[in-house]
Amino acid sequence: MPEGRTLLTMDPASSFGTGSHATTRMCMEQLDALTLDGARILDVGCGSGILACTALLLGGRHALACDIEENAMRVTAENMDKNGLSGLRYSTRCGDLLSDPALRQELGGQGPYDVILANIVADVLIAMAAYLPGWLAEDGHLILSGIIDTRAEEVRRAFRQAGMVIVNEIARDGWVMLCCMRGKGENS
């Protein structure tokens, strides 16, 4: 392994997130480009927990991983353990933040987050534009992926209307990743 790199060990079980899909890889590349020392992370739609694990291994202080699938909570915990990340550095929540006001209040109340990750389909991301930007720290980064290229403009529009500015965009294999911040960058 090259010097200065960190090895991530994953078992996705039946949850999404092996690290081989373009959407996951782009999110991981964006995380690697950020300074995460001491960062508070929210991973929405965590699947196997791969993005939360990556953020912690890159210096994040705490990650909250949320998914609608109960199995994702178990798989995320197992993958955190495989990577030497104690339960004090992460927590998990199961539920659908779009349909559960109590979960939205809990997730929002634990913010602000320095990094919010959401690698989910475009329709869900567009609906989450009503919540995620408000949970982001002033200089935080919102990393969105799971966006098929034909839907990217809809997602861009939804988050721009929510006050976000796209500071980085990666497209690969028909998929798009957007990294957004509040009112910063050139792509407003």
Pin down the residues of each PLM region.
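Nucleotide donor/acceptor-binding cores
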Residues: T6, G38-R40, G140
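Hydrophobic alpha-helical segments and their boundary regions
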Residues: T6-L8, L36, A65, G163
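Short hydrophobic/aromatic-rich motifs at helix boundaries and adjacent loops
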Residues: M1-E3, G47-A52, R104, L125-M128
